[in-house]
């Protein structure tokens, strides 16, 4: 389902723990990390799609989280042509997303990357909210930054601090701290 401009409606999920660290999932058989996200099906509201995607990708149910906020409008990114399926070229531009900020009220052990038979991630970890976005595929970085900046107002942070810390090495300790489903 594409809109008139060629964007697929989608939801993005920033899941925080009690320390305001964010959930990052490692794409299966890739070394790229991302927030959970997915398409909005015909007839679904963004919130319904968010809860469906949260379960499909992270295995969490509505009772495991609390919605803290969402973006006011759609955030868009274009997908480079070489990433677009041949049959979609010419009509598909990219994704437009409503982003949700969630607080995990359950336990880390509630995360189940194999809740469905088509897992999206093979590992996950908590990261600092302002971790550099170098490990995110390049064409999504600006939308991630926009979502993080817009939604931070719902968290208790020192608002005078930098938006993105450049000095921190992204995912440098991933081998030691990846939590994967065995």
Curated annotation (Swiss-Prot):
Entry GO MF terms: pyrophosphatase activity
Region (Disordered): 162-182
Keywords, in A-Z order: Hydrolase
InterPro entries: Nudix_hydrolase (IPR020476), NUDIX_hydrolase-like_dom_sf (IPR015797), NUDIX_hydrolase_CS (IPR020084), NUDIX_hydrolase_dom (IPR000086), RppH (IPR022927)
Enzyme class, spelled out: hydrolase
Source organism superkingdom: Bacteria
Entry cofactors: a divalent metal cation
Gene for this chain: rppH
Pfam families, A to Z: NUDIX
Family of this protein: Belongs to the Nudix hydrolase family. RppH subfamily.
Hydrolase keyword on record: yes
Motif Nudix box mapped to chain: 38-59
Function: Accelerates the degradation of transcripts by removing pyrophosphate from the 5'-end of triphosphorylated RNA, leading to a more labile monophosphorylated state that can stimulate subsequent ribonuclease cleavage.
EC number annotated for this UniProt entry: 3.6.1.-
Coiled coil ranges: none
Lineage, highest ranks first: Bacteria, Pseudomonadati, Pseudomonadota, Betaproteobacteria, Rhodocyclales
Protein name listed in UniProt: RNA pyrophosphohydrolase
Segments forming domain Nudix hydrolase: 6-149
Keyword Hydrolase attributed: yes
